[in-house]
Amino acid sequence: MVSLRDNIEAQPLSHNRRIRKNFGHINLVADIPNLIEIQKNSYEKNFLQLNIKDSERKNKGLQSILNSIFPISDSSNIANLEFVKYEFDTPKYDVEECSQRSLSYAAPLKVTLRLSIWDIDEDTGTREIKGIKEQEVYMGDIPLMTKNGTFIINGTERVVVSQMHRSPGVFFYHDEGKVHSSGKLLYSARVIPYRGSWLDLEFDAKDVIYFRIDRKRKLYATTLLRAIGMSTEEIIKFYYNSVTYKLVKNKGWAVKFIPQHITAHRLTSDLVDADTGNVLLKAGQKITPRLAKKYFGEGLNNILVAHETLIGKYLSEDLRDPASDEVLAKIGEMITSDMLNVINDLKIKNVNVLVINPQSGPYIRNTLFADKNQDREAALCDIFRVLRPGEPANIEAAENLFYNLFFDAERYDLSEVGRIKMNSRLELNISEEVTVLTIDDIKNIVRVLVELKDGKGIIDDIDHLGNRRVRSVGELIENQFRIGLVRMEKSVIERMSAGDVDTVMPHDLVNSKILVSVVKEFFSTSQLSQFMDQTNPLSEITHKRRLSALGPGGLSRDRAGFEVRDVHPTHYGRICPIETPEGQNIGLINSMATYARINKHGFIESPYRRVKDRHVTDEVVYLSAIEEGKYKIGQANSKVDKDGKLQGEFINCRVEGGNFVMVEPQEVDFIDVTPMQVVSVAASLIPFLENDDANRALMGSNMQRQAVPLIKTDAPFVGTGVEGVVAKDSGASVLALHDGIVEQVDSNRIVIRTLEQKIDGSPSVDIYNLLKFQKSNHNTCINQKPLVKVGHYVKKNDIIADGPSTDNGEIALGRNVLVAFLPWNGYNFEDSILISERIVKEDVFTSIHIEEFEVIARDTRLGPEEITRDIPNVSEEALRHLDEVGIIYVGAEVKAGDILVGKVTPKSESPITPEEKLLRAIFGEKAFDVKDSSLHVPSGVSGTVVEVRVFSRRGVEKDQRAIAIEKQQIEKLAKDRDDELEIIEHFVFSWLEKLLIGQVIVNGPKQVKAGQTITSEMLKGLSKGQFWQLTVEDANVMNEIEQIKVHYDEKKDALDKRFATKVEKLQSGDDLPQGALKVVKVFIATKHKLQPGDKMAGRHGNKGVISRIVPEEDMPFLEDGTVVDIVLNPLGLPSRMNIGQILETHLGWASINLAKKISTLVKEYKNKHIGIEQIKKFLLELYGENINYILERSEEEIISFCNKVSKGVHFATPVFDGAKVQDVKDMLKLAGQDPSGQVKLIDGRTGEYFDRLVTVGQKYLLKLHHLVDNKIHSRSIGPYSLVTQQPLGGKSHFGGQRFGEMECWALQAYGAAYTLQEMLTVKSDDVNGRIKTYDSIVRGENNFESGIPESFNVMIKEFRSLCLNVKLEVTSS
């Protein structure tokens, strides 16, 4: 066996990665979790359960829906359709093919169903199996997720955003005194199921409890209690305690003394011990709970109260006559003075009454007596009448309806989460499998509600993240699936009942179209399925990590109040407090924090390090908001000694409710993992975030997502250390799939021979086809560039190619430029930006934008449209860029109005002239009448054609251009196949050589003789095929050769088969939309240089528009002659309070000056003035310990490293744990600069120094997607609105500029009457006047007449619609 790791001299690429000087102090014990795993886990792991054997699938996602819907039986129970298993076929097209052909990337879902037919004996009713049929049924195509967590739907990349919604369960709250004028708090409870009817319970102003179902009319809560089967006695016994009053002759009543029921008050009568007769307190004296406890402790068990005390109390059981057992008063009735007389007359010794006092109000008892329903039947009928008004109420229907509402698992589902929340809130212990309401639930909800009213317990905070959960992709699609399958179930039952079941197969019963349409509708039109923001890799990642409170089942913008949008203490480490849109969606759309993840119940968890006995361990525990409330959590920057023990007397900790307290170190349970866990990915890319005002940080994180990928990428000198993670997880860069050695590299692809050998010992080959100048969703350019060279050894997950906006495996959204903060002739007024001509000349901020144009040749009523070069009435000059088929060449430079694809459409028949009749009579065939319908470049677009794609309908003959494109693609596929085969062959034959050399020949081709010993020279004389003809004496060697041959042939066949499949796909034609014969797509790339009007921004929310481009010689320059690139306004800082940008500028200034210093040292080393030790010493001083592994290498490698940082030293200053002001000063000193970071600047125009020192430094600036080229527009001739006949507005409608009300005032103020008249008539909507004016311009005359504007006629018509006839009458005078 040959080891492939032999002779690897190349260094692993990971040494190629950029080293940053890191200012962080906190050691990271947890890596940032994969940034898009929220999408992938939810869909692939939890919903589809792809790549999991059928037997090992858990009952969740698709499996659980199919299990819950099936089995389906018909009404007579003769046929029964059961679910066995499901699996996915391979998708017809891969991701790339789908996006090119405008198809959806989906896999066919095959479900195995079993249909059982039963025979039912009509006399006995027994059932016997008549037959069982099992069949695999196609249930439609299910969209698959790409490796980057997106979906391809009709050729466009889409993202399904996760939704935040209220967790199922029970919630208690009050109206904050807003409903009733007295400001009284009205408490209410609401049971929110995952699906099913909502149940509300509420108090009114009179303290009566009501309930309502699905916001319908309210009923007494006791009606609900009776409906679940409770009698009056059970209700009273469940909600109240009872106390017995015993008669003491001639003295009054003795009653048990309960100190808990005593509140502080003045006694109205003496407090007398019933057992001893002692007076403990006199009337008028004050009793307190403390005093009551003291008396109780001293043996006070019963007290004596006056006879009249019973008046106003409520009976806790029926009052009966001792002699006849006749009921005198019902349970719950109030004791009146008359009733007390009866009690005395009948000498009743014991009276049981309810304990009702300020701690336990009479609400349930009052509701009972207000409620007219006295039994279960009446209560059920009452509920039925509210929910089904107008239908006759009978007890059976009412019972069914009530059961179906809350107790039927088909219609009501609390979900596992809802059951857990319900159990914990109501202190119940019901199994998690019970996901419907139970009688205990309802009884206890009323109990907790009453306790809240009595002042026990607290209301729920609905914005607490323990009460809001996340529905990710998998769950959202699962809900759609359920809807589709429920609809399908109905159609299956109908089909079972309709036909002869004996002859039917499962596929005859299932109509997959119902399911497909529901899923398709969700992906195409749902508010949560969104067109992916693909401006740059950061915007992609952020979009996938977004949490929206909007969407179906969520909030709506108009109704969301301030509380929902606000930052909540539980957001800490879960939802970013910074990143959210400005405008009406603020706070409703959020971003997940960097380290957060979503647990199986849908709650967001944040990681913490466990603290045991003051000792901070490396154990990382993820806690949800609910669990977090139980612990004391310290901050990540708490002081820790070298043994990992917390230092200091007290530690600042977070406790329940988001409050901060100082606790002793041994009481701390956890500390944060890193300060960065608070913010989102975008915010964690802002260096010195801690020095910025929150509003500006918000703008900064939002604007990074709008940065356009530039031609030349450049990672920031001042970063945060997260740049690499973002580039890797976004999928923009290409990662190596296995360890291996680079065999071939060019700009289009990388071929790597892997080192992970197969079972047969042969290597596999990874071929990475790079994306070249592809269009993104936002018309920016996706282009990948290789980072490796032939012979490089790469490790798994190394970055081997950069994508858009990445530089050496780090995200690079903008460029490092030299800025000066200085007012310059008013050109940087109000955040304007002044730039040097160098920036434009050297393409520093130049970006490429790609637009796609499509033309479809259809089959029309009058005949097919044709793509051709032969277009009527078009000059040869206009056709110069088209090939013989009529499609533009790749590489052609085009501008607005040029023809991209020539197309003609048949014209309708016009009346035939006599001459034509004659011609037709002579020649028979009429000259075919066509009109030009070519695709032209729209206005405002110019550029170079970079790609053309031609799609032809199956069965339609392909044109030459389509064949040429197809040939090119086949050649590419063949090259991939041949290269892979070549690498495998090279390996196989070198292995064969090693086996054969030294063996004795038994038989072989003509050139060799039996008995010879094989040498390498002999083998060189043989062709590759002749190797297999050799037979040698050693049987073991022959066996091995036989095995190699088998494996080699298998590999070769597999490659050929794969090639053949792909070629067949290319040649077979395309599935085009209805009626389309041919589709041509043309891609035009435009270079956008920076120009006045373009918007730029830094990472700190400092945005501005370019006001002027100044020649280099006029720009301010440094004393060494370096010209400043950009001049910014210093007044943009103080009021905005984003000081982070100044610290960034200073550190950037240190960065380039340190780089200059390193370059000088290298120069001196090369001139032999200094040794390598001085360079090492300087690098050690600069980078610290983490550079040791480079300093231990050879001198050449150290110099090579120094050359890499010759442009600027890269820093990492992590969020909230980065460089302090002193660190920045230290770096400036090390670079030999003034610690103030300010320098003398010279004015380029006068050559004189500016009066004061100026802050100058390297700053990272971004070019945003708001380009002036796409905004500015003017109209000459264009469309008019149908009703008002005024020109349309806006660039997309090619509209005009509105001359509005205020503009009219301006003309009126100047008295420019004629100008005003023409503005309001012929230049706008006087139709006849417009035509006449056009005529007079054509004739060269200068006069015009204005008539009545069309909008005046519209107004008159509106008057008439109001029955007012307004006429314009011209009188003769």
Curated annotation (Swiss-Prot):
Q: Known catalysed reaction(s)?
A: RNA(n) + a ribonucleoside 5'-triphosphate = RNA(n+1) + diphosphate
Corresponding gene?
rpoB
Pfam families from the xrefs? RNA_pol_Rpb2_1, RNA_pol_Rpb2_2, RNA_pol_Rpb2_3, RNA_pol_Rpb2_45, RNA_pol_Rpb2_6, RNA_pol_Rpb2_7
Print the keywords alphabetically: DNA-directed RNA polymerase, Nucleotidyltransferase, Transcription, Transferase
Supply the source organism for this entry. Rickettsia felis (strain ATCC VR-1525 / URRWXCal2)
Tell me which SUPFAM superfamilies the record gives: beta and beta-prime subunits of DNA dependent RNA-polymerase (SSF64484)
Q: How does it assemble?
A: The RNAP catalytic core consists of 2 alpha, 1 beta, 1 beta' and 1 omega subunit. When a sigma factor is associated with the core the holoenzyme is formed, which can initiate transcription.
Q: Which PROSITE patterns is this protein grouped with?
A: RNA_POL_BETA
Q: Which InterPro entries match?
A: DNA-dir_RNA_pol_bsu_ext_1_sf (IPR042107), DNA-dir_RNA_pol_bsu_external_1 (IPR019462), DNA-dir_RNA_pol_su2 (IPR015712), DNA-dir_RNAP_su2_dom (IPR007120), DNA-dir_RNAP_su2_hyb_sf (IPR037033), RNA_pol_bsu_bac (IPR010243), RNA_pol_bsu_CS (IPR007121), RNA_pol_bsu_protrusion (IPR007644)
Enzyme class, top EC level, equals: transferase
Q: Which GO terms describe its molecular function?
A: DNA binding; DNA-directed RNA polymerase activity; ribonucleoside binding
Query: Which protein family is it in?
Result: Belongs to the RNA polymerase beta chain family.
Q: What does this protein do?
A: DNA-dependent RNA polymerase catalyzes the transcription of DNA into RNA using the four ribonucleoside triphosphates as substrates.
Q: What is its EC number?
A: 2.7.7.6
List, in alphabetical order, the GO biological process terms annotated in this UniProt record.
DNA-templated transcription
One GO cellular component, as annotated? DNA-directed RNA polymerase complex
Keyword Nucleotidyltransferase appears in the UniProt entry: yes
Query: What is the name of the protein in this document?
Result: DNA-directed RNA polymerase subunit beta
